[in-house]
Regions:
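Short, surface-exposed loop/turn motifs with a glycine/proline- and acidic-biased composition
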Residues: 60-95
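Non-cytosolic beta-sheet module surface loops
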Residues: 34-39, 49, 92-94
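Short beta-strand/loop motifs in extracellular/secreted proteins, especially
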Residues: 41-44
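Sec-dependent N-terminal signal peptides
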Residues: 5-12
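Short, glycine-anchored, charge-dense loop/turn motifs used at functional sites
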Residues: 48-55, 86
């Protein structure tokens, strides 16, 4: 019998930020999401309004390290969102890795 029992814990981490925040989609600005992850995986970006209505969804391949992708402030139906705060979530297919945050759109 082995005297030692080894426990390996693999931490699958996702760090995500976006900039500029706030941004003016009406003036043609986009916000850039910067996602840093420790392993490659296929992900999905979801953007919701504050009533939990899904406005935007995009499947994105993630590489280990830094990844960059943008959002122009338009829904999947190509409609400009109103000024306000929106929630974003980045998940893998099992929803076991989650990056999340808020993005503020100011349309003037």
């Amino acid at each position: 019998m082995n005297k030692y029992t080894w426990l390996f814990v693999f931490l699958l981490t996702v760090t995500i930020i976006n900039y500029p925040n706030p941004f003016n989609a009406k003036a043609g600005q986009t916000t850039t999401f910067e996602c840093t992850t420790d392993t490659a995986f296929n992900s999905t970006l979801y953007i919701y309004d504050m009533t939990a209505r899904l406005l935007f969804k995009r499947d994105l391949p993630m590489n280990a390290g830094a990844n960059h992708f943008g959002w122009n402030g338009y829904t999947e139906q190509n409609e400009l969102v109103n000024s306000g705060v929106y929630l974003y979530f980045l998940t893998d297919k099992n929803h076991s890795r989650v990056g999340k945050g808020k993005v503020w759109v100011i349309n003037r």
